[in-house]
Amino acid sequence: MNPVTKQFQFGQSTVTLETGRIARQATGAVLVTMDDVSVLVTVVGAKSPAEGRDFFPLSVHYQEKTYAAGRIPGGFFKREGRPSEKETLTSRLIDRPIRPLFPEGFMNEVQVVCTVVSTNKKSDPDIAAMIGTSAALAISGIPFAGPIGAARVGFHPEIGYILNPTYEQLQSSSLDMVVAGTEDAVLMVESEADELTEDQMLGAVLFAHDEFQAVIRAVKELAAEAGKPAWDWKAPAENTVLVNAIKAELGEAISQAYTITIKQDRYNRLGELRDQAVALFAGEEEGKFPASEVKDVFGLLEYRTVRENIVNGKPRIDGRDTRTVRPLRIEVGVLGKTHGSALFTRGETQALVVATLGTARDAQLLDTLEGERKDAFMLHYNFPPFSVGECGRMGSPGRREIGHGRLARRGVAAMLPTQDEFPYTIRVVSEITESNGSSSMASVCGASLALMDAGVPVKAPVAGIAMGLVKEGEKFAVLTDILGDEDHLGDMDFKVAGTDKGVTALQMDIKINGITEEIMEIALGQALEARLNILGQMNQVIARPRAELSENAPTMLQMKIDSDKIRDVIGKGGATIRAICEETKASIDIEDDGSVKIYGETKEAAEAAKQRVLAITAEAEIGKIYVGKVERIVDFGAFVNILPGKDGLVHISQISDKRIDKVTDVLQEGQEVKVLVLDVDNRGRIKLSIKDVAAAEASGV
């Protein structure tokens, strides 16, 4: 196959799609170049599904090679290791809009690999990777209802929406949003914002959808010219005989089971009914069906039952209407020795959230393609199996936990004080102790509460809510505060976090085409109503940050020293600063501009360290009396140390009013004496007097 290249303009960027030159054994491969950012995207699809598989095994791997930025990896092995958090999050970002576009019943394994091979360090390669994924799938012949387009959107009050902003532009942007979708519909939104209105957020989504039509047109042109033949694959026909048989026998019982409001009781009853279905209809004899097929059809009936009830206006699974938030229980200060803690319970979803304050040294060091940087705010989300009443894997966080933690972080990050205002490192951990829908939004609420309990001066409380959608034909229902089952059986997962003034995070995943602007407006409106309700209840428990930090939190003192004095504080090989830290049990961070941050487990420890630093950096003041130590005696006087590293000369004539023949008649090395600073010359030499001390003290110096 000869290489095929397609070039198009995408906003201010020139994008080139090339196939047929690299990775030709993959089912589909495209090299995307977008303003000096190049990403190689490959797609491989298995020709047949594995025996007995009942799920679609799609995997997306986004990887950043350090050579792309002209760097060699750190560490002992000097090669890329496990995926970074950024790589994991981008893999999820690509997965989410493409997964719903594979046909129902398609069980062949598909693997997408996006490799960043060159970057200009000025913009995120994720949009190029998403464009490449769309193109590689479009030319592969694999059943896929694409192509998709993707765009990043920024917002500036004076400029308006910005298409695919650079890192530099994002610094002054009050929005960072990624949108992906097809020609007709938006499928995925991921964003963080600085209290933008619902209308501004919706406008950004629609702006992105209009702009990425250029991507979709270019991918279609590439597929027309270089696409492989479409696979001869047909979706398995629905077994209407089995569907009707199970519905006739158990349909009413399934419907009744979905009126049980307690999750575990409902699951137990549905499990019994599923077992009955298998016992009645599964087997190898004539007229029977495989057990796996019976279970699949039973699940299909569950899906249809719940959806029909909702769109026809019947009460939801737990008896609520479409706009009601589950009952809340909010507690703060629940863990005695932590810096800040909260227990947030919404129905059968519960998060125990803890905030911890640390020193500047506790900040996370991130090694990215753009270089190393520090992150002084971390939010970690843990989802243990006991939260859903199951046994399961324990260990390092999975992709879902990393993604949910990042969403919760986005929700509260805009409300945090700056490092200048509050120079602590902040770590928030959300332990999901019960889960039945929207645990990430419970984490947002719990994080806001825990931060205020810790005394972190957040700008405003933040709450989050998850919305759902069920759409059947022209009928639809937007659901507030969805349950786990409603998430699984619905058509949309729409999460909104924000303050009473505006949105701080919006995440949307849509499983169907045809989500209209009207539906998104209704969802945002209901989310605002629910968010204000939750904030009102949170404010009854704690409405503003505590006036003082927890007594368990480290004390932090700030000061500024002359940058020329930094080496004096650090000492030879770090000896001086190390001695101060060891002796006072405090830690000291010094910036190049002379900013000093001192952290101590107690106020006394921090103050002691501060006094030591002050003593080292202090300058001798003319007319001030010091208590010094005689360091060295010479014929013409004595050198007295009055400050760390600062000696002054007491001339023999300044020792006493009486005539002295030998200095050693009056002074000895190591002797403590009071001295008065007479003068400091332009070379820093200090002239001292002992004999004038008495007169100076008498005059009140």
Swiss-Prot record:
Biological source species: Pseudomonas paraeruginosa (strain DSM 24068 / PA7) (Pseudomonas aeruginosa (strain PA7))
Record carries keyword Cytoplasm: yes
Subunit structure: Component of the RNA degradosome, which is a multiprotein complex involved in RNA processing and mRNA degradation.
CC cofactor: Mg(2+)
Key words of the record: Cytoplasm, Magnesium, Metal-binding, Nucleotidyltransferase, RNA-binding, Transferase
Similarity-based family: Belongs to the polyribonucleotide nucleotidyltransferase family.
Protein name: Polyribonucleotide nucleotidyltransferase
Domain of life, source organism: Bacteria
PANTHER family: POLYRIBONUCLEOTIDE NUCLEOTIDYLTRANSFERASE (PTHR11252), POLYRIBONUCLEOTIDE NUCLEOTIDYLTRANSFERASE 1, MITOCHONDRIAL (PTHR11252:SF0)
NCBIfam families, A to Z: polynuc_phos (TIGR03591), PRK11824.1 (NF008805)
Reaction equation(s) it catalyzes: RNA(n+1) + phosphate = RNA(n) + a ribonucleoside 5'-diphosphate
Molecular function terms from GO: 3'-5'-RNA exonuclease activity; magnesium ion binding; polyribonucleotide nucleotidyltransferase activity; RNA binding
Domain KH: 554-613
Primary location: cytoplasm
SUPFAM superfamilies associated with the record: Eukaryotic type KH-domain (KH-domain type I) (SSF54791), Nucleic acid-binding proteins (SSF50249), Ribonuclease PH domain 2-like (SSF55666), Ribosomal protein S5 domain 2-like (SSF54211)
Gene Ontology BP, a term: mRNA catabolic process
EC number(s) given by UniProt: 2.7.7.8
Protein localization: Cytoplasm
Positions that bind Mg(2+): 487, 493
UniProt cross-references to PROSITE patterns, sorted A to Z: KH_TYPE_1, S1
Sequence ranges assigned to domain S1 motif in this UniProt record: 623-691
Gene Ontology CC annotation, any one: cytosol
Function: Involved in mRNA degradation. Catalyzes the phosphorolysis of single-stranded polyribonucleotides processively in the 3'- to 5'-direction.
